[in-house]
């Protein structure tokens, strides 16, 4: 949120490293759901606070502030929990493929969140690039949800680099960084 895309490099990378390092401790698939839900709740709690400000103008609506502040992020976090629940069924042996699976699952559940129950397409991770108009020009070609998957993959590069096991993973990081620089320049 807040158009500071650099924050996503830290949050996604640290979260992905946490999941990979806790793989042996997270024996139950529900634990992945729990951590995904907590990640989503924190994200939506921090980025949807502004809804409560709209409820302060009328005295009768102030009673809805706790509902808007807690229940909306709680509900939306279920989608991230479901994404990580499905992620838990994949074998944890190659970090590059896991990062791509992680990105695709998050992207799919962002799409579902944006279209189910009349949709809630707010706060996609790609929106953190909204101040970089040059970067988001590709939206006219591939669409918001596709760029969202690419951005999540891009945000996981530091995690892949930290967790690297082979030279091919370093090569993957370099290629993806070059693609990102290309998009930022052109």
Predicted regions and their residues:
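Membrane-embedded alpha-helical bundles of multi-pass enzymes
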Residues: 1-186
